[in-house]
């Protein structure tokens, strides 16, 4: 029996022997949409996904679902935020995302399928030469986004009137475990919160189960909340 293993063992060294090829980088669309719609970015040939955030009592507080084309464009995106009583459902139609219910044009796109403008809120987005959204602006605020060499979002800085809010994330040094990270939130040069996340990963280096710890340092004593994130992901 052991001799039958030799061809596969040899193939492991030469080609990987049917191992899933891991894509370590994030596409501009995935990284940028994750910033704007507040979900963990995913890698590889994702076909559809659902991320569910649950509190310590197991109650769902937020759910994000999306379907993507083979080119990596979001064909649809749905956000359910129970804490803020918000529901957003978008479907792709040419150069716009329409409201899935009313079919009203909500988001204008640029390039292949990247964010360009949210007319109803007066928000416009700017991209860098690689297609990543690096700025968002309106009359009331300015936002700047940061990414690492693999396209992983490293945080953002928001300026509105006399307030500056900065979120800075530090991911794991292991490129496979990119969604294991810590983050610090600073408001007007004063630290007001921190976050720590640790996950289990699938063969595409995407998180399937995560623990998220959020500490609100803006109150005394600080308040710690523990959440669980469940991901279901289908691939092409």
From Swiss-Prot:
Keywords: Cell membrane, Lipoprotein, Membrane, Palmitate, Signal. InterPro entries: UPF0257. Transmembrane segments: none annotated. It is found in: Cell membrane. PROSITE patterns: PROKAR_LIPOPROTEIN (PS51257). A lipid is attached at residue 17 (N-palmitoyl cysteine). Belongs to the UPF0257 family. This is UPF0257 lipoprotein YnfC. It comes from Escherichia coli O17:K52:H18 (strain UMN026 / ExPEC). The lineage of its organism: Bacteria, Pseudomonadati, Pseudomonadota, Gammaproteobacteria, Enterobacterales.
């Amino acid at each position: 029996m052991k001799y039958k293993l030799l061809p596969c063992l040899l193939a492991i060294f030469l080609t990987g022997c049917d191992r899933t090829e891991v894509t370590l980088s994030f596409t501009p669309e995935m990284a940028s949409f994750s910033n704007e719609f507040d979900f963990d970015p995913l890698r590889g040939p994702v076909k559809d996904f659902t991320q569910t955030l649950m509190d310590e009592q197991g109650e769902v507080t937020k759910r994000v679902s999306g379907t993507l084309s083979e080119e990596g464009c979001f064909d649809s995106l749905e956000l359910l935020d129970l804490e803020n009583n918000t529901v957003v459902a978008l479907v792709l139609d040419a150069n716009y995302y329409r409201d899935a219910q009313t079919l009203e044009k909500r988001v204008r796109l640029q390039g292949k399928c990247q964010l360009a403008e949210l007319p109803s809120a007066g928000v416009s987005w700017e991209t860098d030469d690689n297609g990543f959204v690096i700025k968002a602006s309106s009359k009331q605020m300015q936002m700047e986004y940061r990414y690492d060499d693999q396209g992983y979002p490293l945080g953002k800085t928001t300026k509105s009137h006399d307030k500056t809010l900065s979120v800075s994330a530090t991911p794991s040094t292991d490129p496979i475990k990119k969604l294991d990270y810590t983050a610090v939130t600073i408001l007007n040069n004063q630290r007001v919160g921190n976050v720590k996340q640790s996950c289990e990963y699938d063969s595409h280096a995407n998180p399937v189960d995560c623990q998220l710890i959020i500490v609100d340092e803006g109150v005394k004593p600080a308040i710690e909340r523990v959440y669980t994130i469940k991901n279901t992901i289908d691939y092409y």
